[in-house]
Amino acid sequence: MPNIPLRVNSLATEHPNNAQNSDKMPTFDAIFSHLSAIASHNSHQIIALLPSSDANWPAALIAERLTQAGSKQHLQKQHLHLHLFAQHQASWLKALAESETLASPAKEQIKAICDARVSGSHRLKLVNARLIIDIHLGDPLTQLKDLVSPSLASQAIQGWLANTQATDEALIWQMARLSQDNAEFLLLENNDVNLDKTSNNANTNLLTQLIIKAGFTCYRLNLSLKDDQLVTLAEKPSLASLEIAMVERRALRRQQLDKFAFNPLTQGREGETAIIGGGVASANLALSLAERGKKVSFFCMDKAPGEQASGNKQGAIYPLLTPEHGSLSHYFLLGYLFSRQRIKQLLESGHEIPHDFCGVLQTGHDERSHKRLTKIINAQPWAESIARPVDALQATALAGVTIEHQGIYYPLAGWVSPQAFTRAAISQAERLGKQTSHYQCQITAIRFENQQWYLSAIQDGQKVEFGPYANLVLANGRHLTDFAQTDHLPISGFRGQVSHIPERAPLKDLKTVLCAHGYLTPAHDKLHCTGASYVKDASNLDYSAVEQVENLDKIRTSYGGEWTKAVDITGHSARVGVRMVTRDHAPMMGCAPDFEAISATYISHQQTKKSTKESAKCWQTTSAPVHQGLFILGGLGSRGLTSGPLAAEILAAQLCGELLPATQDILALLNPNRMWMRKLIKGKAL
């Protein structure tokens, strides 16, 4: 790796006792090139940083690395994955977001994460995903425990850099669980002159021994020294202690797997992956796999992507908040921030995506919904950038039309063209990766034969076969349950008609998305969109005059202003699609459950008269049956723009055996088998 000195002005403002060297900061490469596990020839480096909350050195290091990446000269063949663990108010994270050396869009994205104050894993993908940064916000030990060990050893963390102030034994063992067997540890010495030297040295020596006990080769890092002296080898573990440490690491991993056996996170197999789809979710999955250099065959029943539920002219993108802010609300917040990032990345890559992050204004439409919104906004200390309460006057000023009620304003939200977003993601995937696309290809059956997947299809009026494929992902919206392997999935289709409203005064003054009993967008191409209807298991997708009137009524009953008279549906212009919805409103993402095997085991428990407690324990500790190599991505409901891209990224990480950018509760929330397993692990009837 190159060893290029870099002057970092941002460190000059540090307190003298905390600054490692205010005149010169060693480069990222100068520090990590000392580690053999992170050799310069390694094309994929995975490094984690765990600084103390008040440290400022990480901002300088990361800004320098991002600047290199932005030059498009340094990381052309090398992929770097950084994991950053930070408290919400960590000064170094704030310094990174405000760094003058950090270019947009990275600066903007990191600032959005800081401002949002949303705990959990935030993924940033830069320079066509050659540089990935996962920011894990919250208590570091909690965040580490919540991360699932990568199923592929080569995808585990190769090196750690942590302050002595930020490290203890519990943290070290969780770091070890997430690491490669030969991973190394850089322990940053504390140079604060105000500390007692004897006590400081004793603490450093103790931490060094704990790090070695956990199986790491430990190095000490002193940023005040020259590049050729800043890293010194503290000690390597003996062969005997290393063997004990590896046993402990495996036990920790097994303990976690056993705890969540009902939620299998099996990785994909080596080889080509087939994706059946055509909407936002499948397109983003194709892009996520292309960024990893994976070979993909993409199957779409239509002549182009984005012709089904993702074909609307405009769709609202905003979070789904709840008063208790549980896993569902938390996931939608993370997904919301990731979707915004994805859209901006595609725009920066030259793709045209009509959109406007003009904000979303949500108001109630009856007494119950008014009370619900009041409860939501008052229940949590939402960040100003996420959601804030507004009165009727403020709402009117934001909307540009008269709003007679108080509500919630989402400043970062807005609208985007789902079809354009879908097509841009597919186009970028084809540009980056090894993707073959098949259009006007209706998959009629799938089968697993000789450990491979095969597809039967109708294309150009002819029966054709495709395969073999190592992995198969069903992301085909309303056709998700068309196959024998998935026809029991607890998911339903809801028809939705979106009405197109001509732009005219005073409606054309609308400048933010309105959401109450339905939504209404600002005009694009001289049309507003409003809707949508919600009809379960509809028999057809024809235009409905009844639903057109219902959409109009929703607007006029939600808002009493004179401007609603300009909402004109007489042109009978609308678009109809079907969105797939789960009972808990969360998407389905992960291994395809084998319902026949689940049902057979359940019946066996009944026949052998297992007690409720015995049956529950069995389901809790036994890996739930799945179809090998088959995965589900669907059930995005009405907010697929918010939830779909992140679900696709998590699934791509699972397929590739990586450390997943999601906590265990969110992974359990998304699992396609959750409706059944929630009952079975409690000993209830299937």
Swiss-Prot record:
Q: Which UniProt keywords apply?
A: Cytoplasm, FAD, Flavoprotein, Methyltransferase, Multifunctional enzyme, Oxidoreductase, S-adenosyl-L-methionine, Transferase, tRNA processing
Q: Which InterPro entries match?
A: FAD-dep_OxRdtase, FAD/NAD-bd_sf, tRNA_MAMT_biosynth_bifunc_MnmC, tRNA_S-uridine_synth_MnmC_C
Q: GO molecular function of the protein, one example? A: flavin adenine dinucleotide binding
The record's Pfam families line, in alphabetical order, gives: DAO
What is its subcellular localisation?
Answer: Cytoplasm
Q: Please, which domain of life does this record's source organism belong to?
A: Bacteria
The gene coding this protein: mnmC
In which family does this protein belong, per the annotation?
In the N-terminal section; belongs to the methyltransferase superfamily. tRNA (mnm(5)s(2)U34)-methyltransferase family.
Cellular component aspect of the GO annotation: cytoplasm
**Location of region: FAD-dependent cmnm(5)s(2)U34 oxidoreductase:** 276-686
Annotated EC: 2.1.1.61, 1.5.-.-
Name its species: Shewanella loihica (strain ATCC BAA-1088 / PV-4)
Give the disulfide map.
Answer: none
Q: Decide whether keyword Oxidoreductase is in the record.
A: yes
Q: What does this protein do?
A: Catalyzes the last two steps in the biosynthesis of 5-methylaminomethyl-2-thiouridine (mnm(5)s(2)U) at the wobble position (U34) in tRNA. Catalyzes the FAD-dependent demodification of cmnm(5)s(2)U34 to nm(5)s(2)U34, followed by the transfer of a methyl group from S-adenosyl-L-methionine to nm(5)s(2)U34, to form mnm(5)s(2)U34.
Question: Which one GO biological process term can you cite for this protein?
Answer: tRNA wobble uridine modification
User: Which protein are we looking at?
Assistant: tRNA 5-methylaminomethyl-2-thiouridine biosynthesis bifunctional protein MnmC
**Keyword Methyltransferase part of the UniProt annotation:** yes
Q: Which cofactor does it need?
A: FAD
The segments labelled tRNA (mnm(5)s(2)U34)-methyltransferase in the record are 1-258
Locate the coiled-coil region(s) and give their ranges: none
Q: Which reaction does it catalyse?
A: 5-aminomethyl-2-thiouridine(34) in tRNA + S-adenosyl-L-methionine = 5-methylaminomethyl-2-thiouridine(34) in tRNA + S-adenosyl-L-homocysteine + H(+)
Q: Which PANTHER family match?
A: SARCOSINE DEHYDROGENASE-RELATED, TRNA 5-METHYLAMINOMETHYL-2-THIOURIDINE BIOSYNTHESIS BIFUNCTIONAL PROTEIN MNMC
